[in-house]
């Protein structure tokens, strides 16, 4: 106990060997556990060594670190939530995003959530830039479920929290999306089979400031549904689950802050970008073997889903290819609720592409980089407000 060894060194045990690399130390703590520490934890940000080219081992370590943070977020959300929907059905997702709202890593949660949450984060950034939302501060959390700005359907509420690392602007974002049991509307459960407008389906939120300086803004929250004809039927449970999402996001902040403190913000951002670039390369290898094709499907109500898929040169990178998915020919948005928001359409495409990959990579924004979606505004895969969307979201998620 108390013994300390500086790397490089090799520690032989009865059942294996431990490699202590240069820059690391190994010590035995009071519990007789071997603790490995990197010297970078003793540096200030200015003193940290210059970044080295990222190798596959370092990239894999960071990939698992990012995913572990998202998993910790999910576990805290499960443990602190109140509703059966989140606590037992596990209808929630947690993820990390870069400063631009690009998905970096996630826990293996709900695909339609994970592929669309980035749209919600980017919508928040756009509204901040347009002064439609106050400048973000440490301790903020905002809520959004708007299907026309990154949401899926109204019961899925996303809590978005910026992560600051000493600068004026967020360095990262963490977000959690949960399916809430009821958000008001004409039917209990907020999934009416006969809705014809988004107003029928419940509470609509777009970047509502829910937490400021770590305190719940109850006045903002209560004002958001005060004028609704049919308000949420169990507001106490809804509020409790939203507070659980805030707690989950706090777990994500803590994980990222510890990682930045240990490794430095520059290296963390470099590894996030590297993870996305690697995913993009994997998708490019996939599409290089695909052929042009088209498909059309008639639904029970006579509506048409049409798609043409083509591999074309990338205009921004002439030596690379991109996969174009053209949904022109798809029927106009329906009078009922079989309309899938563009964020759902995007999430479905992203998940299908991820399933086709042989590479073991997390779903992230890089998977979408070599893709181009052409979805006409006003069709049933990209409806305009105030279209009803609850059935389109469900059918798209199950497709």
Residues covered by each model-derived region:
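C-terminal, non-catalytic interaction/recognition modules in large multi-subunit enzymes and RNPs
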Residues: 1-399
């Amino acid at each position: 106990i108390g013994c300390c060894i500086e790397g490089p060194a090799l520690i032989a045990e009865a059942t294996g060997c431990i490699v202590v690399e240069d820059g690391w130390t190994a010590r035995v703590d009071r519990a007789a556990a071997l603790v490995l520490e990197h010297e970078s934890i003793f540096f200030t940000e200015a003193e940290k060594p210059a970044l080295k080219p990222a190798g596959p081992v370092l990239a894999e370590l960071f990939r698992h670190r990012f995913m572990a943070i998202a998993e910790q977020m999910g576990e805290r959300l499960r443990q602190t939530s109140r509703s059966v929907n989140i606590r037992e059905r596990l209808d929630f997702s947690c993820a990390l995003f870069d400063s631009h709202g690009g998905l970096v890593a996630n826990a293996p949660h709900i695909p339609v959530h994970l592929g669309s949450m980035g749209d919600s984060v980017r919508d928040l950034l756009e509204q901040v830039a347009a002064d439609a939302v106050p400048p973000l501060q440490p301790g903020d959390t905002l809520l959004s479920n708007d299907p026309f700005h990154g949401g899926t359907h109204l019961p899925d509420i996303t809590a978005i929290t910026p992560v600051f690392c000493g600068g004026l602007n967020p360095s990262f974002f963490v977000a959690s999306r949960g399916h809430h049991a009821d958000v008001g509307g004409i039917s209990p459960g907020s999934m009416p089979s006969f809705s014809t407008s988004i107003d029928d389906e419940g509470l609509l939120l777009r970047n509502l400031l829910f937490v400021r300086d770590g305190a719940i803004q109850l006045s903002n929250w209560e004002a958001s549904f005060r004028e609704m004809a049919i308000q949420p039927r169990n507001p106490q449970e809804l509020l409790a689950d939203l507070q659980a999402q805030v707690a989950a996001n706090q777990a994500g902040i803590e994980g990222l802050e510890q990682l930045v403190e240990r490794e430095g913000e520059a290296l963390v951002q470099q590894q996030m970008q590297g993870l996305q670039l690697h995913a993009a390369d994997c998708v490019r290898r996939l599409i290089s073997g695909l052929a042009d094709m088209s498909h059309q499907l008639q639904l029970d109500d006579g509506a048409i889903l049409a798609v043409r898929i083509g591999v074309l040169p990338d205009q921004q990178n002439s030596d690379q290819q991109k996969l174009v998915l053209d949904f022109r020919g798809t029927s106009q948005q329906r009078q009922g609720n079989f309309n899938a928001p563009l964020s759902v359409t995007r999430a479905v495409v992203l998940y299908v592409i991820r399933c086709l990959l042989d590479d073991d990579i997390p779903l992230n924004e890089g998977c979408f980089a070599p893709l181009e979606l052409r979805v006409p505004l006003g069709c049933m895969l990209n409806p305009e407000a105030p279209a009803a969307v609850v059935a389109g979201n469900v059918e798209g998620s199950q497709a």
